[in-house]
Amino acid sequence: MLLSKLSILLAKWLSVAVYAGTLVHDEQFIPDHILRVSVAQVPSACENREDVVVNGTSPGPAIHLLPGARTWIRVYNDMNDRNLSMHWHGLSQRFAPFSDGTPSATQWPIPPGHFFDYEILTEPEDAGTYFYHSHVGMQALSCTGPLIVEDCGSSPYHYDDERILLFQDHFQKSDLEMIQGLTSTQFTWTGETRGILLNGRGVSPNQAAVQGRPGEASGFFGSHRFSNFRAGDGTSNSWDGIRGDDQIEPPTDCTLPVIDVEPGKTYRLRFIGATGLSLLTMGFEDHNDLTIVQVDGSEYNAPVTVDHIQLGGGQRFDVLLRTKTAEELRCNGDKTTYFLQFETRDRPDPYRGYGVLRYNLGTPVPAAPTTPALTLPAEVNNWLEYTFQPLHPSSSLSPTAEEVTRRVILEAEQKIDPATGRLVWKLAHMTWTDMSRDKPVLVDIYERGEAAMPDYAAALTNYGWDPATKLFPAKKDEVLEIVIQNTGSHYSGASGIVETHPFHAHGQHFYDVGSGPGKYDPEANNAKLASLGYRPIKRDTTMVYRYGEGKVAPGEPAGWRAWRMKMNNPGVWMVHCHILAHMIMGMETIWVVGDAEDIVTIPLSVSQNYFTYGGSVYGNDTHAPEVYHYFDDTNKCCAAGAGDSEDSGH
């Protein structure tokens, strides 16, 4: 059934004319997907909160993309007083210039009352689970949604159906209140998460889940794939000319989230870590056989079987779950609901929440158990380290130690900035936020060419970054080993405290070569990789753990994470912690790959449309945007997408 719908989607794609150069996106232009972002009071974790929502809900609709095809996604900023951007998390190397959605790095944000058309080109090998989110302030807490790239033909793993499980944090403070506290000289922390949401539904510690009605909708509409679209006001309509998208049903009562399944089937569970703070550990009651087949999209891995999942902010895991047969359910007393239990880790105020795996729509949704359904492991540091390897090892392009040309250490420090009196996070002794520049770096390079480029020689003697521009330069095709080195806090209010960080790279995937306690020792880690015969898979988000008891002497090394990357995608890209509060406090870096000639790929006559805030590439009620079409409409997946049978690979 899934592939028959894909064939319909493919036929619509192939009917689009081939464009080239600059076009006016007037009423004749029909984008493939539309996202309208606004502000609304949302029933979140059984409480009300003002959230930034997408098409009326948080999370927003699940966007399904065909691999090997160009896609246009129109993003409207319907907010009155806030800028907006949209980042396509994990789809590295797959978007046109000025489309990465990072305001300080690659594009001006979308002004209130305007829209921007994002151009994305997927490749056949991009099949996997991703997500989109705003890259402005704390908006990504709620302004987010799933982004699924379908398989080009058959998946290498058989499954009958799939379910999306997107996790978010719930905070009682408003986005603005949290930002003000983080950036004040009288530092005020955001507070800990007050609830974990699964597909928009969860329970705050101040509330209690009640029993739900039989058949109540929850999560994304699996049966409405490619046909449902929810307008900005929350109403549903078909949008005949626009691909449809799954969307959650907003909660109307305080019940647990539900994952509906049928007996005796294999489900592909797409776990998405859209949390802005929390690292989660989770497992299913009486379902201990979970097979991880893909991590962070992009590449299938050799199967790894576990009994629980660990999910940090920005990470994704695709997991095969074999449900119980009808006979097994009968032998288990006709039990048709089982709890999914999830708990936060490495935070001072832990949270435990539940979802429900339900086998029968006629079964009422149970309330949360009074005692834990599972005992989940407390330690997170060694979960599946040095484990994930390619499904096809011969095709691995993971750089060896001998190929590494340079090592950059990003030492993570928390301290008071003497210039501002604010508490900040630093990487490699430098702090960066969206306020560090008066214009995006990519715009500056297009305008001034080599004069805007960072000094490579100066960076070599200054922790990897140029002191004049605060940018990390990399030569095209050089092989870097990037090490994030965790240390104890210098802040008197948290002296020696060590935090766990999810680190994410834009622009291209990296090969994760491990982690460990203390200070990074490249010789020891290379020996470990050799002894294991380990060839890592491509990743875009991995964890830097705190190790030990989470406290060392101020500035003392506490743990590390190492990546290897061949810098083969010229452009301007971010590497940053994916905890939103830490980003606002400066835990971000900007990398410039290649020289100006490599980066400037759009003619000046049209690229200048992107140079100003609210310029001609941004549409509004009175102006149709003038947009450069970077990719053509050649579909690299035509034969595979149209030729497979319905049941192949699923």
Curated annotation (Swiss-Prot):
Its EC number is 1.-.-.-. It is an enzyme of class 1 (oxidoreductase). Cu cation 1 binds at residues 87, 504. CDD domains: CuRO_2_AAO_like_2 (cd13873), CuRO_3_AAO_like_2 (cd13895). It catalyses: 2 2',3,4-trihydroxy-trans-chalcone + O2 + 2 H(+) = 2 3',4'-dihydroxyaurone + 2 H2O. N-glycosylation Asn-55 and Asn-83 is involved in folding, conformational stability and laccase activity. Disulfide bonds join 46-254. GO terms for molecular function: copper ion binding; oxidoreductase activity. SUPFAM superfamilies: Cupredoxins. Residues 1-20 form the signal peptide. Cu cation 4 binds at residues 501, 577, 582. Keywords: Copper, Disulfide bond, Glycoprotein, Metal-binding, Oxidoreductase, Repeat, Signal. Residues 41-151, 162-360, 439-595 form the Plastocyanin-like domain. Pfam families: Cu-oxidase (PF00394), Cu-oxidase_2 (PF07731), Cu-oxidase_3 (PF07732). Glycans are attached at residues 55, 83, 620. Retains almost half of its activity in presence of high salt concentrations up to 100 mM NaCl. Retains also more than 85% of its original activity in the presence of 1 mM EDTA, indicating a satisfactory resistance towards chelators, which is rare among metal-containing enzyme. The activity drops significantly in the presence of NaN(3) or SDS. Appears more active in the presence of methanol compared to ethanol, but acetone or DMSO addition severely affect remaining laccase activity. Optimum pH is 4.0. Cu cation 2 binds at residues 89, 133, 578. Optimum temperature is 50 degrees Celsius. Cu cation 3 binds at residues 135, 506, 576. The thermophilic yellow LMCO1 presents a number of superior properties with potential use in industrial biocatalysis via its ability to oxidize a variety of phenolic compounds. Monomer. Yellow laccase-like multicopper oxidase that is able to oxidize a variety of phenolic compounds including standard laccase substrates such as 2'-azino-bis(3-ethylbenzothiazoline-6-sulphonic acid) (ABTS) and 2,6-dimethoxyphenol (2,6-DMP). The existence of an ortho-hydroxy group is crucial for oxidation since pyrogallol and catechol, which contain ortho-hydroxy groups, are readily oxidized, which is not the case for resorcinol and hydroquinone, that contain meta- and para-hydroxy groups, respectively. Belongs to the multicopper oxidase family. This is Laccase-like multicopper oxidase 1.
